[in-house]
Amino acid sequence: DLMPPIFKYASLSEILQDYVYQHNQPGQTELELLLEPEDNFDNLSQKVSLEIYRIVQEAVGNSLKHAQATLVKIILVREDNKVKLTVSDNGRGFEQQAGKTGIGLTIIKERVENLRGTLTLNSAPGKGTELIVEIDLENLEK
């Protein structure tokens, strides 16, 4: 993965805020971003920041393309060395069948594995989709 130049000049918080601004579709699909605490992502490594950004891009892209959602929420929380990313939508959801995932989800799984994190996916028809990524930054330093 080539590091996009923006990561040299902006923090993950700023990049995500810009992404939401660029992809928000008022009247169609609203994007909401919550950073908790907002200034606590600036010292993440570029690698971690990029992987989180790419996961957000893929997850939001899936919601915009497939879910027919009117709301997509992106929540990024950091407590000490733990980072939790949740991307959820109020779209149509899907049946979770063992072993069946689309290419987008496969890409997300690979990125989560790169971060030695865990991925939880909750979805059901008519119930929307929730994707949760949990990363322990201490695992990345070993």
Task: List the predicted regions and their residue ranges.
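Coiled-coil dimerization/phosphotransfer module
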Residues: 1-142
